[in-house]
């Protein structure tokens, strides 16, 4: 399919709007991390009980990414985006109105359905809409929108929730999505589906050991991170005994450090992606190990969060870039699988953190998260040695 020639300005506006959409979708996934205590208080529940919402959301995305991608594979992309945004916005209105925890979970499942479709098509859409010769920059913009969700979206959502209530945070995200939808309707041309892949491309991807090994690494390292990260807000208040305001500051520091991580990866990622990811996983191991000892002071936790934020950003960007490089002939299927696998890790980590907090002690989330982190480090070293050229340069 050939899109009618458009000015570079319009082409970039389309990509930027998609990047804003990526920011909004990732913000709504992560923002409950900063609102757990407030949601728990409003429904008279324990924080760890509310935390199961994180696992449900992530696993719905994980399970539904590939089926939804296949079900919508022939659907015109502009129409598909409009439909999933309508579902996304309506579900946020329901989150705002939620009269009990069950209704809130149902609303989050609706958002997760929209999320599952969005992330399976976004990378390939960005490539199609990009100005000539600017595909890499377009993907970088989408990655930046994703990264900013943790850098700005989560902390801002936490601040809004702290001062105006958690319901207002969800309502604001819904309104942001509505504005973005109106921009997409105005800017996007009709986009017939192409290169979306099908079940036929799955065996092809499964026969790529470098890609499969990367998927395994993704789920293990994401599980490690989210075991601790999912409960960092109640950890700061209940274990470290620090204020709710400092919990907000810490989330800002952790997210802001992601900017440093993205700059580092942008500078060195093309040449040294494998080494950077391995070093970042090693840094994650150290951060999780030191989480409880660092809880003795605000300064120690702040310093640790800087390195933690850098590490997880480098890991996330590295994985995404490698998956796209290893599956250029089936980007939608590969990214749907990646999104699903990433969310299996989020859900698993949140569930482990939930169980540790409920049945043992929230103070142990760093130590427990360190177990899969160490396994991820060993696996990373092994696979990057076995497929150094494949992972760095080749699509097969």
Curated annotation (Swiss-Prot):
Top-level taxon in the UniProt lineage: Bacteria
Family: Belongs to the major facilitator superfamily. SotB (TC 2.A.1.2) family.
Gene Ontology CC entries for this record: plasma membrane
Protein name per UniProt: Probable sugar efflux transporter
GO molecular function: carbohydrate transmembrane transporter activity
Alphabetized InterPro entries for the sequence: MFS, MFS_dom, MFS_Efflux_Transporters, MFS_trans_sf, Sugar_effux_transptr_put
Gene this chain is encoded by: sotB
Residue ranges of the TM segments: 15-35, 50-70, 81-101, 103-123, 136-156, 169-189, 209-229, 246-266, 275-295, 301-321, 333-353, 364-384
Subcellular locations according to the entry: Cell inner membrane
Keyword Iron-sulfur: no
Function comment: Involved in the efflux of sugars. The physiological role may be the reduction of the intracellular concentration of toxic sugars or sugar metabolites.
Membrane topology summary: Multi-pass membrane protein
Keywords in alphabetical order: Cell inner membrane, Cell membrane, Membrane, Sugar transport, Transmembrane, Transmembrane helix, Transport
Species of origin: Salmonella paratyphi C (strain RKS4594)
CDD domains the UniProt entry points to: MFS_NepI_like (cd17324)
């Amino acid at each position: 399919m050939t899109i009618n020639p458009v000015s570079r300005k319009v082409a970039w506006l389309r990509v930027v709007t998609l990047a804003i959409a990526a920011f909004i979708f990732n913000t709504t996934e992560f923002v409950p991390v900063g609102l757990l205590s407030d949601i728990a208080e409003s429904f008279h529940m324990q924080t760890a009980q509310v935390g199961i919402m994180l696992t449900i959301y992530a696993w719905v995305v994980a399970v539904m990414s590939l089926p939804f991608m296949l079900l919508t594979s022939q659907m015109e992309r502009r129409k598909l985006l409009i439909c999933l945004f309508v579902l996304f916005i309506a579900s946020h209105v329901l989150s705002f109105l939620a009269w009990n925890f069950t209704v809130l979970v149902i609303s989050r499942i609706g958002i997760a359905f929209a999320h599952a479709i969005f992330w399976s098509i976004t990378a390939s859409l960005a490539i199609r809409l990009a100005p000539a010769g600017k595909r890499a920059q377009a993907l970088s913009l989408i990655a930046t929108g994703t990264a900013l969700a943790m850098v700005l979206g989560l902390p801002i959502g936490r601040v809004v929730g702290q001062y105006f209530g958690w319901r207002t945070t969800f309502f604001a995200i819904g309104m942001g999505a509505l504005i973005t939808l109106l921009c997409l309707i105005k800017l996007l041309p009709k986009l017939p589906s192409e290169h979306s892949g099908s079940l036929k491309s799955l065996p092809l991807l499964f026969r790529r050991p470098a890609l499969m090994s990367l998927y395994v690494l993704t789920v293990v390292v994401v599980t490690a991170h989210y075991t601790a990260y999912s409960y960092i807000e109640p950890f700061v208040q209940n274990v470290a005994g620090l204020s709710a305001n400092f919990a907000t500051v810490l989330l800002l520091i952790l997210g802001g450090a992601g900017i440093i991580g993205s700059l580092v990866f942008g500078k060195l990622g093309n040449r040294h992606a494998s080494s950077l990811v391995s070093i970042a996983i090693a840094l994650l191991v150290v951060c999780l190990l030191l989480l409880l000892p660092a809880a003795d002071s605000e300064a120690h936790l702040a310093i640790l969060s800087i390195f933690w934020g850098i590490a997880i950003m480098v890991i996330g960007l590295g994985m995404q870039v490698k998956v796209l490089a290893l599956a250029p002939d089936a980007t939608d299927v590969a990214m749907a699988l990646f999104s699903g696998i990433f969310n299996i890790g989020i859900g698993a980590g949140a569930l482990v953190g939930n169980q540790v907090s409920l049945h043992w002690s929230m103070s142990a989330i760093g130590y427990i998260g360190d177990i899969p982190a160490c396994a991820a480090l060993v696996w990373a070293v092994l696979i990057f040695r076995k497929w150094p050229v494949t992972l760095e340069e080749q699509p097969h």
